[in-house]
Amino acid sequence: MFRRLTRHPRFLSLAARLLGLYVALAHRTTRWTLVADGATEALRGGLAEGPVILAFWHERLTLGPGLWVTMRGRVPALAPKRPQVLVSRHRDGVFIGEVVARFGLETIHGSSAKGGASKGGSAALRAMLRVLRGGGVVAVTPDGPRGPRRVAAPGVGQLAALSGAPVFTYGASTTRCLRLRSWDKAMIPLPFGRGLMVLLPPFVVPPEAGEAGRAAVEALLTEACDAADAWAEAARVGPRAGPGEAAALAAARALASRAPPALATEAAASRPDEARRA
């Protein structure tokens, strides 16, 4: 009886609205530090007026909408845009859609299952391409909706290659949070903590980059999350910044200012000897 009740659409809608309110409360009561020098410079330099792909791991889904709220205030060109978040067609996707709607985000229903064979996957890809070709923003969790954790599906590389849109990778962490026993070890922020947002400079995936695009997204997302987690771990020792916290913040700033990767096409990568002779 109780299990049937928790799966009822009205119950899920109410629970999602309550979670959305909670996530908004946690975001507003957390003292955030944004590390995004390279990304902010690129957006203010004109990229904000065109298509943008924002990627973050599924485990940081509750920390994703807060980045948009923060960046929209820093980059005026982003203000009129409403990001489209890719979610699954399963009921958990509908649940997530209700949560992110609290932050002014919209949803595209599809999936990103490994191997590219997924219900609604091709339709979702077409929908995202339409958004990007119209100059919009698409947010994706490359390891969602079912994992494996921190393993990017091919779809994000394909989307970037087909659209030509720059990819921004994002990680965040807080000093006060819970970790769920889910496949992704989802992070739920608690109110009244401190947090770090790490947004890395954008990179473009060439049409023939192949596996390199997917691998780059995976590596950069993990680096961003690890940098944020290292800072949060150091910052938990007390309310005042210590040497460990300062060092972790400096490392995150260096990462966020690093030049983005320049991806070669698979054809060029397969001829290293010819490239060296040239």
How does the language model describe each region?
Residues 2-21, 27, 81, 101-106, ...:
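Non-catalytic C-terminal accessory region of glycerolipid acyltransferases
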Residues 24-51, 63, 69-73:
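A short, well-structured juxtamembrane/interface segment
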